[in-house]
């Protein structure tokens, strides 16, 4: 599957009070994938918000991905992104079917990426590459890993961790396909700035 562009990831705290307006602003600017990331245990709210996001994604012809919850993804008929401790990738693939997008966190490990491909991943994700507000304690990943993955794994490569419009070009130059961005997109002062940033990220790819 060809996946290339901006991979917008929601943050419920960052988007408090402006959740749908900022997400729609990003979609208006252009988003390849939108990931709903909510680590709380409020299942009813998560279902409601994910359903609202799916409606927006359908309007803008963007693919929705659910973070760490294959059952919610199956309920909505969308894709899922799994961390290394968030359940079995083969089980998620079996649950969601062969057409669904199933992404895998690989941190900084080429071996994890090779295993993810064998297990049926659609794309592999690496990071953090820069200082990250979302995962401040995560170990840094060297830029040259991207080229190694491209040579060995042959799946779309998502990169995450402190990505901004200023540092994103070097990730693209090293071979990244998907720029996974949280604060660098949604940390804007207003919705118009979110749209501007989304357009600018998409222009890099």
Curated annotation (Swiss-Prot):
Residues noted as binding 2-[(2R,5Z)-2-carboxy-4-methylthiazol-5(2H)-ylidene]ethyl phosphate in the record, renumbered to the chain: 132-134, 162
Alphabetic keyword roster: Magnesium, Metal-binding, Thiamine biosynthesis, Transferase
InterPro entries (alphabetical): Aldolase_TIM, ThiamineP_synth_sf, ThiamineP_synth_TenI, TMP_synthase
Single GO MF descriptor: thiamine-phosphate diphosphorylase activity
Enzyme Commission number: 2.5.1.3
Residue sites binding 4-amino-2-methyl-5-(diphosphooxymethyl)pyrimidine per the record: 35-39, 67, 105, 135
Binding site for Mg(2+): 68, 86
GO cellular component annotations of the record: cytoplasm
One annotated GO biological process: thiamine biosynthetic process
Gene3D superfamilies named among the record's database cross-references: Aldolase class I
Catalytic activity of the protein: 2-[(2R,5Z)-2-carboxy-4-methylthiazol-5(2H)-ylidene]ethyl phosphate + 4-amino-2-methyl-5-(diphosphooxymethyl)pyrimidine + 2 H(+) = thiamine phosphate + CO2 + diphosphate; 2-(2-carboxy-4-methylthiazol-5-yl)ethyl phosphate + 4-amino-2-methyl-5-(diphosphooxymethyl)pyrimidine + 2 H(+) = thiamine phosphate + CO2 + diphosphate; 4-methyl-5-(2-phosphooxyethyl)-thiazole + 4-amino-2-methyl-5-(diphosphooxymethyl)pyrimidine + H(+) = thiamine phosphate + diphosphate
Protein's pathway: Cofactor biosynthesis; thiamine diphosphate biosynthesis; thiamine phosphate from 4-amino-2-methyl-5-diphosphomethylpyrimidine and 4-methyl-5-(2-phosphoethyl)-thiazole: step 1/1
CDD domains recorded: TMP_TenI
EC supergroup of this enzyme: transferase
Cofactor descriptive note: Binds 1 Mg(2+) ion per subunit.
Superkingdom in the source lineage: Bacteria
Role this protein plays: Condenses 4-methyl-5-(beta-hydroxyethyl)thiazole monophosphate (THZ-P) and 2-methyl-4-amino-5-hydroxymethyl pyrimidine pyrophosphate (HMP-PP) to form thiamine monophosphate (TMP).
Protein family per UniProt: Belongs to the thiamine-phosphate synthase family.
Protein name as it appears in the record: Thiamine-phosphate synthase
Organism: Pseudomonas savastanoi pv. phaseolicola (strain 1448A / Race 6)
């Amino acid at each position: 599957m060809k996946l290339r562009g901006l991979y917008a990831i929601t943050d419920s705290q960052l988007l408090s009070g402006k959740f749908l307006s900022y997400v729609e602003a990003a979609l208006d600017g252009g988003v390849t994938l939108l990931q709903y990331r909510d680590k709380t245990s409020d299942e009813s709210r998560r279902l409601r918000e994910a359903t609202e996001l799916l409606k927006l994604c359908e309007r803008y012809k963007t693919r929705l991905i659910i973070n760490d919850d294959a059952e919610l993804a199956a309920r909505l008929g969308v894709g899922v992104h799994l961390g290394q401790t968030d359940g079995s990738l083969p089980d998620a693939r079996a649950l969601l079917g062969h057409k669904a997008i199933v992404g895998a966190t690989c941190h900084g490990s080429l071996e994890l990426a090779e295993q993810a491909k064998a297990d049926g991943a659609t794309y592999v994700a690496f990071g953090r590459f820069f200082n990250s507000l979302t995962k401040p304690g995560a170990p840094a990943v060297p830029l040259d890993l991207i080229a190694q993955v491209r040579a060995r794994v042959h799946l779309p490569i998502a990169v995450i961790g402190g990505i901004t419009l200023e540092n994103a070009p070097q990730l693209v130059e090293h071979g990244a396909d998907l720029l996974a961005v949280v604060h660098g997109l949604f940390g804007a002062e207003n919705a118009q700035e979110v749209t501007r940033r989304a357009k600018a990220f998409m222009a890099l790819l």
